Amino acid sequence: APSRGLGDVYKRQVINKEFSAKEDFPSGGYNIEKSNAAMSLMKIIKNAFEGDFSKYLAEGKQVKVIITGSADASPIRGRIAYDGRYGEFTDEPYYKDGNLDNITVTKSSGITQNEQLALLRAAGVHSYIEKNVTTLNNTKNDYEYHVEVAKERGGEFRKINVEFVIMDAFQQ
């Protein structure tokens, strides 16, 4: 990728901050409250946005929140129950391998594909941020879901990643 000069960065006035936690979830799990790594990550995000970043989050600022939920390659046998804790998703848009697609996960559908599991992991992050990161209550937030399904099995592939892009960050 071409390197960007500092001038470009200042022109764009974008702050881009990425947070990541690995080995977040038990196999088949999607509840972020049951994952120590995920909850540590959520606390780091909350502290950052209510601390250092709060000065960039004036009312009406646009913030893009790109949340990537990942699943490993372990096949889902049968169906994992979904309790609806993060809402019901019908034709929810998401990106996988750079392509826009859509996905449905409801209490009645349950979870039969790793993509659905990965989406719910991302949805848990979305839910936490909306409920707990108070400084994002007055900004215009655009959430985007990305889903990754690894070709390998293992805890390190069951993870979440959150990227925040604050537009016009340096304008008062």
PLM region spans:
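Extracytoplasmic
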Residues: 18-20, 60-62, 155-162
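Single conserved hydrophobic/aromatic residue that forms the stacking wall/gate
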Residues: 1-10
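Acidic/histidine-rich, surface-exposed loop or edge segments in extracytoplasmic proteins
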Residues: 15-31, 104-109
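Periplasmic OmpA-like peptidoglycan-binding domain that tethers envelope proteins to the cell wall
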Residues: 70-171
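Non-catalytic substrate-recognition and accessory regions of acyl/acetyltransferase enzymes
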Residues: 11-18, 52, 56, 68, ...
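Periplasmic peptidoglycan-binding/anchoring modules of Gram-negative envelope and division proteins
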Residues: 25, 29-97, 126-130
